[in-house]
Amino acid sequence: MTSETVIAPSLSTAQNDGTFTYDKVKSTAKERKHLNLKNPSDANEIKSKIWNYYSLSELIQYLGQKENDDFKYKRITLQFPDNLICDSATIVHELQRELNIVPQANQDTGESNTAQRVWILADTSYSACCVDEVAAEHVRSDLVVHFGDACLNEIDKLQAVFVLGKPTLDVDAIVKQIKTAYSTEQKVVLMSDAPHTYLLPEIAKQLPDYDILIADLPKTSRAKIIGYTPPPTGHKKFNRVFNTDTVEFGKYELFHITSPESPRLLQLTTNFASVTTYDPISGTVSTGPFPNLMRRYKYVHQARMAGTVGILVNTLSLANTKVLLNTIKEKIKEAGKKHYIFVVGKPNVAKLANFESVDIWCILGCDHQGIIIDQINEYYKPIVTPYELLLGLSDELSWTGKWVVDYKSVLEEYGNEVIQQNEDPDTDEDLPPVFDPVTGRYVSTSKPLRQINHLMVTSSEQGGVDDHDNQLVKRFSNAVAIKGTVSTSAIHLQNRHWTGLGSDYTEDENATGALVEDGRKGIARGYDI
């Protein structure tokens, strides 16, 4: 044997921090371009910018109002768009500190009748320019503070406060763009989104040789604008106020700061001689292409030929929404067509594609962001506005090219119009055939409820329809009816190649179905059992 020392073999590899590389979550600082921060990591600078941008001093003074030694607003909800949600935590902290509001997590379970409370509303990414009354009612709010750009449409129930913010602009660059685009002989309207409106007078002052008309913000009856004083009077149009009695907008060129959404842009392009948009971030201008109005004329004809109309309700907070909804329902019924009402939240192609029996959609939404303008034929069925639908349902289709989205204007034009119907059942077969002007095909289902009072579907085998029959769809000599009324959905189901599980059986299903019972009612916060 040798005297050498035996070294035990290493059972593991020596490891240190440099042996392996671990993936780490990268911390990305929020840009907050709207605040123009020089040092994004400085908390004091961020707080100071937020105070100035949102005019928090005036907001706190408004929220601290009292009536009879008690707070006027106790349940306050804050609504933020997606691009401003990064400031929500700081704003809530400042409001709680200045108003002496105890955070909700530190309060007792019992609700106080004198204390103020603050909530941040969630899920308002679609049509964020409107006040979300439905979300505010979940906490029984008595005031909604809306931050960011707003459509400023009249709201229905709640009191609201608009905090638009005070963004900055390169005024000299905008003045240079206006001088390049227009001559002194042209009439120009200066317009922007709501947050940039306070800068328009400053821009107009630097253009003394031009005929400039400023689009100011309107005064709303149930809302206050923080940091801005709207003019008391003026000509109101496009949710703006013009300092004149009457305006012929067709003779004016529009220079719009920021690029509006498609519904707003289509509304403006149909009323002005030309439209030029300015992007304040890139500093570039654009003169098109913009949404096409001729496509809307095609949809009006398709609405005239449609047999089933889906009414898509995108907002319930705007004034006159319920009145317009009831008016549309009556007009559809007078025209002999069927309708269904849908509330699907944020619409998309997949949601609307589930309802194949709907021939055309009528959308009730905000004229700024709540109307779907399908420019690339993404949706399977056409989507029209209430004005376009009522225009298509009228007896004589005559369109001047104007595009109306204001609820009040639509009601004034079509609210009292009566659609004529032929009440003589004997002359129904003598009516001229209906052809689709778009495709040229014969349309037999454009008025499925025509003369509903005289509709009789009989069977030679049974001699009529049994009121106690529980079968959903009856086929009588090539007709499809539900309890004696023609069903467009049943006709659509009958014409499909595959109608669901069990459709390959020829015998009738005689089994008794389950009884329908009342379920829970209310919202997720508290159901009524």
Swiss-Prot record:
Keywords: Cytoplasm, Iron, Iron-sulfur, Metal-binding. Its cofactor is [4Fe-4S] cluster. It comes from the Eukaryota. GO terms for biological process: protein histidyl modification to diphthamide. It is found in: Cytoplasm. Transmembrane segments: none annotated. The keyword Signal does not apply. One of its GO terms (molecular function) is 4 iron, 4 sulfur cluster binding. Signal peptide: none annotated. One of its GO terms (cellular component) is 2-(3-amino-3-carboxypropyl)histidine synthase complex. [4Fe-4S] cluster binds at C130, C151, C366. Pathway: Protein modification; peptidyl-diphthamide biosynthesis. NCBIfam families: diphth2_R (TIGR00322), DPH2 (TIGR00272). Component of the 2-(3-amino-3-carboxypropyl)histidine synthase complex composed of DPH1, DPH2, DPH3 and a NADH-dependent reductase, predominantly CBR1. Belongs to the DPH1/DPH2 family. DPH2 subfamily. Required for the first step of diphthamide biosynthesis, a post-translational modification of histidine which occurs in elongation factor 2. DPH1 and DPH2 transfer a 3-amino-3-carboxypropyl (ACP) group from S-adenosyl-L-methionine (SAM) to a histidine residue, the reaction is assisted by a reduction system comprising DPH3 and a NADH-dependent reductase, predominantly CBR1. Facilitates the reduction of the catalytic iron-sulfur cluster found in the DPH1 subunit. This is 2-(3-amino-3-carboxypropyl)histidine synthase subunit 2-1.
